[in-house]
Structures are given as structure tokens and as C-alpha cells.
UniProtKB/Swiss-Prot annotation:
Keywords from the named record: Ribonucleoprotein, Ribosomal protein
Cellular component terms per the entry's GO annotation: cytosolic large ribosomal subunit
Gene3D superfamilies, per the entry: Ribosomal protein L33
Keyword Ribonucleoprotein: yes
A Pfam short name: Ribosomal_L33
Ribosomal protein found in the keyword field: yes
Signal peptide from the UniProt entry: none
MF GO annotations: structural constituent of ribosome
Protein name, per record: Large ribosomal subunit protein bL33
Record family assignment: Belongs to the bacterial ribosomal protein bL33 family.
GO biological process: translation
Organism encoding this protein: Hahella chejuensis (strain KCTC 2396)
Domain of life (superkingdom): Bacteria
Amino acid sequence: MREKIRLVSSAGTGHFYTTTKNKRTMPEKMEIKKFDPVVRKHVAYKEAKIK
């Protein structure tokens, strides 16, 4: 089953993306580079739980 996750910016701006991932095939925490419009740069986004 795919679970909803939140990708939080490592730049500390508070910006986040939401996405889904398959926990069975990817049990580790996701980390991906995406664009942060607050700092207008590509930064690392790390997985966090949706509250």
C-alpha cells in the first residue's frame, strides 16, 4: 500500500512537498533534490510524516 509522506526542505524555510511512496519496496527514508521557491535554489528534501 502506498503511504502519503511529506518532503521537508533542508534549507529551513518550512516549505514542503507531499507525495506517496511504497513502503514495501522503499523501507528507508526518502531524500531527493527539489526546487525550493523560497530560497529559489535546488536543495535536499527529506521525508517526514504527515501530521
